[in-house]
Amino acid sequence: MVSKEQKLALIKEFGGDEKNTGLAEVQIAILTAEISNLTEHLKMHKKDIPTRRTLLKKVAQRRHFLDYLVKKDVNRYKEVIGKLGIRK
């Protein structure tokens, strides 16, 4: 789970304003943070199947946001994957 402070920092970094939470970039950044937290959890708890399912759902959700961003603005897409270190 991403803390409130981490989420607020991501919103400010990718959205510009703390009320601008709906941007695809902000959603992708928050999902990426949640995915990394779940990945770390699964490294320690390998048999936690419900968490693995949640991880896969979040990865798919992030993929949808990335696909949307590619259709709308390729430059913003490249900027986001560069900042977050996401593979294409």
Curated annotation (Swiss-Prot):
Pfam families: Ribosomal_S15. The keyword RNA-binding applies. Gene3D superfamilies: 6.10.250.3130, S15/NS1, RNA-binding. GO terms for molecular function: rRNA binding; structural constituent of ribosome. GO terms for cellular component: cytosolic small ribosomal subunit. Signal peptide: none annotated. Keywords: Ribonucleoprotein, Ribosomal protein, RNA-binding, rRNA-binding. InterPro entries: Ribosomal_uS15 (IPR000589), Ribosomal_uS15_bac-type (IPR005290), uS15_NS1_RNA-bd_sf (IPR009068). One of the primary rRNA binding proteins, it binds directly to 16S rRNA where it helps nucleate assembly of the platform of the 30S subunit by binding and bridging several RNA helices of the 16S rRNA. Forms an intersubunit bridge (bridge B4) with the 23S rRNA of the 50S subunit in the ribosome. Part of the 30S ribosomal subunit. Forms a bridge to the 50S subunit in the 70S ribosome, contacting the 23S rRNA. This is Small ribosomal subunit protein uS15. It comes from Mycoplasma mycoides subsp. mycoides SC (strain CCUG 32753 / NCTC 10114 / PG1). The gene is rpsO.
